[in-house]
């Protein structure tokens, strides 16, 4: 009998604790909308952060709660947007396809060197000491953006500048974040004209440093003043939609080709 009392006591305590756990589970259980799992499984699982959340699962939770737009996943595009809208029973938002473009034409041949850089071969490291080019606004040529792209949508071209593979670009924005000189921007795929320069130096100085730099001559802004202005010694497109097709030839009279069509050869052919 002496041994039975401890056994009964332990059994009773085990039963009591078990009942307590069951009660706590039911009382403290957090309900999760099954749509979160449904949407999460359909997402690309890139976990790139382009949606503004920590990963695909976090985005799924946010979109189900109404905290994120159905079109918030740029990697998924229209297909994912439509799927999310159908799952939530709402109207799908319009998806504007965007592509990352480099605002620089400072190739090895065009942009003059100011010295030899022997440090760590990254743009961020080179940027800390001003880079090895005379232009302090141009591309540093070390390819941080290429290494940051999770979709193999960038490669370093023979001229020393990163080249975008349009069919692979998802507008995730990783290249935008990777560039220490903010040379990448996400533009609607339909936008054909951009400014291929970010230099804010005075025209004469810019031209000496890089023959493809904007010299703020004003040809483009005079051709289309309602869409293009000159600010801080640099051409700036205020509204691409206001650029009429018949104005494009005038805009492209730019003496340094620092503004113009992205696909000029394709459009001419």
Task: Give the residues covered by each predicted segment.
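Ferredoxin-type iron-sulfur electron-transfer modules and their immediate structural context
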Residues: 2-217, 221-223, 248-269
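A generic structural motif
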Residues: 161-165, 234-242
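Strongly charged, low-complexity linkers/loops
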Residues: 219, 229-234
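Surface-exposed, short loops/turns at beta-strand junctions within beta-sandwich domains
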Residues: 242-248
């Amino acid at each position: 009998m002496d041994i039975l009392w401890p056994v009964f006591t332990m059994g009773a305590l085990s039963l009591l604790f078990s009942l307590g756990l069951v009660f706590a589970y039911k009382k403290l259980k957090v309900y999760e909308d099954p749509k979160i799992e449904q949407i999460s499984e359909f997402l690309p699982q890139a976990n790139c952060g382009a949606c503004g959340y920590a990963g695909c699962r976090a985005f799924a939770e946010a979109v189900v709660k109404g905290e994120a737009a159905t079109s918030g996943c740029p990697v998924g595009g229209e297909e994912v947007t439509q799927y999310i809208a159908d799952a939530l029973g709402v109207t799908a938002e319009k998806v504007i396809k965007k592509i990352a473009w480099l605002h620089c034409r400072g190739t090895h041949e065009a942009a003059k060197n100011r010295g030899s850089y022997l440090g760590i071969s990254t743009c961020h490291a080179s940027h800390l000491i001003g880079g090895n080019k005379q232009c302090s606004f141009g591309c540093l040529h070390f390819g941080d953006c290429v290494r940051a792209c999770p979709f193999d949508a960038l490669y370093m071209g023979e001229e020393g500048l990163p080249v975008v593979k349009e069919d692979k670009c998802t507008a995730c924005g990783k290249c935008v974040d990777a560039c220490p000189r903010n040379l990448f921007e996400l533009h609607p795929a339909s936008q054909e004209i951009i400014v291929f320069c970010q230099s804010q130096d005075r025209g004469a100085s810019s031209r000496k440093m890089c023959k493809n730099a904007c010299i703020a001559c004003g040809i483009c802004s005079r051709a289309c003043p309602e869409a293009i202005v000159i600010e801080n010694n640099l051409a700036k497109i205020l509204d691409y939609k206001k650029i009429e097709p018949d104005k494009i030839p005038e805009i492209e009279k730019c003496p340094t080709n620092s503004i113009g069509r992205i696909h000029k050869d394709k459009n001419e052919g």
